[in-house]
Amino acid sequence: MRVKVALKCSQCGNKNYYTTRNKDKRAKLELRKYCPKCNAHTIHTETKA
């Protein structure tokens, strides 16, 4: 089953992206994405949507 999650910037805390992930995986998603508030590519971590 897939669940909706938000990706939050690790520097400013802004929720910039929403995606889905497999619920069976235990580790949190960590992706390097662009943050418009920071104006840079930063690590975004998974949070509840």
UniProtKB/Swiss-Prot annotation:
Keywords: Ribonucleoprotein, Ribosomal protein. One of its GO terms (molecular function) is structural constituent of ribosome. SUPFAM superfamilies: Zn-binding ribosomal proteins (SSF57829). PROSITE patterns: RIBOSOMAL_L33. The keyword Ribosomal protein applies. One of its GO terms (cellular component) is ribosome. It comes from the Bacteria. InterPro entries: Ribosomal_bL33, Ribosomal_bL33_CS, Ribosomal_bL33_sf, Ribosomal_zn-bd. One of its GO terms (biological process) is translation. It holds the Pfam family Ribosomal_L33. Belongs to the bacterial ribosomal protein bL33 family. HAMAP family: Ribosomal_bL33 (MF_00294). This is Large ribosomal subunit protein bL33. It comes from Thermotoga maritima (strain ATCC 43589 / DSM 3109 / JCM 10099 / NBRC 100826 / MSB8). The lineage of its organism: Bacteria, Thermotogati, Thermotogota, Thermotogae, Thermotogales.
